[in-house]
Amino acid sequence: MLPTVFIVSDGTGITAETFAHSILSQFDQKFRLVRVPFVDSLDKAYATVEKINEAAVHDGRRAIVFTTLVDSESNDIVKRSNALVLDMFQRFVEPLEQELELKSSHAMGRGHQNADTEEYKTRIEAINFSLAHDDGQSNRNLSEADVILVGVSRSGKTPTSLYLAMQYGVKAANYPLIPEDFERGKLPSALAAYSEKLFGLSIDPQRLSEIRNERRPGSKYAAPENCRYEINEAEAMMRREGIKWLSSTHKSIEEIATTILQEIRLDRQSY
């Protein structure tokens, strides 16, 4: 029986879930994850306790609960459940209150009240930019890009571009390197003026073949020998052009994005 882990939040639960994944990944154990977002009333807190207790009875062991509930009364209710409750909010807020000699607002959703701020607008603009400049579909306003990702098809450019835009407000374009570029031995002409904005993504040829076979099974596009050729040529071109690059094979989107931000020295963040 897999241990049941509850992610309990008065908001979306994204913060709690991200933290929980980081902690749980340290253990060689699979878990059953149950997300309980928007617990913003006492009634919902009591209903959550019922779910947790039912899971404990079913599993024959205490559940594990990661909570970011701001309301202390709701938090106290959840803490009375048959579970190991890891209160992420209080764990950090109380020491900060002591250190800063200030009381926190304890207001629900405080981290999402900036919907009309410049940061939010910047993020929306970045998302629209990344969508418009996905896979080289537009060369307009490339000068506005914070970074232009290059690499062969299916090397992770699109999800990385969108993650950079959504999470950090980074205007990330992406451009595919194709066999015609390798035959010419040059980058696409549209990128020539933006060499300082380029960052490359590569990938293990075998993994690339597997991904491409999901899209076009049995095609030359997905053939292992073609994938090896494209990767070898792309990496040679990036070295020749002095483009910083990394392999996306064993990295998460979060790791790739963080590395890119460090390499291009962009200090932009949306909250």
Curated annotation (Swiss-Prot):
Function: Bifunctional serine/threonine kinase and phosphorylase involved in the regulation of the phosphoenolpyruvate synthase (PEPS) by catalyzing its phosphorylation/dephosphorylation.
InterPro entries assigned: Kinase-pyrophosphorylase, PSRP
Keyword 4Fe-4S recorded: no
The protein, known as: Putative phosphoenolpyruvate synthase regulatory protein
Keywords: Kinase, Nucleotide-binding, Serine/threonine-protein kinase, Transferase
Domain of life: Bacteria
Transferase among keywords: yes
Residues reported in the UniProt entry to bind ADP: G151, V152, S153, R154, S155, G156, K157, T158
Catalysed reaction equations from the record: [pyruvate, water dikinase] + ADP = [pyruvate, water dikinase]-phosphate + AMP + H(+); [pyruvate, water dikinase]-phosphate + phosphate + H(+) = [pyruvate, water dikinase] + diphosphate
Family: Belongs to the pyruvate, phosphate/water dikinase regulatory protein family. PSRP subfamily.
